[in-house]
């Protein structure tokens, strides 16, 4: 048999195989947002290295992402309305589309089949098939009286029961979109929940949806076990207060953290972390810290609380003992600390240091830096273990 005619084909196939990333799992992979360049890095959490840089993801100035349930794909939500499906194993963009004019986040459904995006323009939520990115449903937000636009949508999260929950900033509402019966959602609307809900979170057990209010103090809470009870106001003093203090950056409500029966919350405009009883949502303590907190995050064993800060204190990270509420260490990773992310079992914490163009890895037990990678204006850090958690 003469194999000579097949030789060029075999060489081509072998060359193609040599260019593929090696076979591996995806459980320890992460994604770093490089906000200035519209690029991301794919991270190896075990080796503490960068596997690849993927470019062409558009405006990532306020980007976030979620993971597919098999942890192979990341869905990146860009500020320019871009929705990008990123293949972490092939290290490339799988699919990408521009679905709106100005987006502010997204979520993936409980069964992993649907990806939802919240939009400022056009105001509303669009829901896509996670495999094909084909449009499944479009949910326009409330039309604003006398204006040619809809309310902006914020605080979109997934909830148990194949539901999405989100807030309407301009019209002061919370909506539940229930997809449990198919691709046409059943909508439940809660009106007059407070002025200008600007962000929201869902508790780790998926029971409570909490919306922060920009236009007044307090928070709006919806019990998803008993939505028939409506929205109630909690934490009446939470906010900027009667004396309007300068707020250098509104804290992300997704940066709240719950450790055992305590919730640790960044105070707005104050150099404090508030401690709440997570059973009745009443304040029990206030911890003085180095600046205005942005993200307050718990180590996965709940023993420590890590806090970063708005300018001009954004070169620091403080570590709080969750039992005594004492600040046990002040770290100085460098200028422009934007985000932190723990590994799934808590042996590492990754810190983005924007103004130093660095991504740092720290040992949260010894409180020592154990690695550093170059990065272009790094911001959000997301590891694939998030795929198995409600609201992440």
From Swiss-Prot:
It comes from the Bacteria. Required for the biosynthesis of heme d1 of nitrite reductase. Could have a dehydrogenase activity yielding sirohydrochlorin from precorrin-2 or dehydrogenation of propionate side chain C17. Keywords: Cytoplasm. The keyword S-adenosyl-L-methionine does not apply. Disulfide bonds: none annotated. The keyword Cell inner membrane does not apply. It holds the Pfam family Cytochrom_D1. Its main location: cytoplasm. It is found in: Cytoplasm. This is Protein NirF. The lineage of its organism: Bacteria, Pseudomonadati, Pseudomonadota, Gammaproteobacteria, Pseudomonadales. InterPro entries: Cyt_cd1_C_sf (IPR003143), Haem_d1_sf (IPR011048), Host-pathogen_enzymatic-act (IPR051200). One of its GO terms (cellular component) is cytoplasm. SUPFAM superfamilies: C-terminal (heme d1) domain of cytochrome cd1-nitrite reductase (SSF51004). Gene3D superfamilies: C-terminal (heme d1) domain of cytochrome cd1-nitrite reductase.
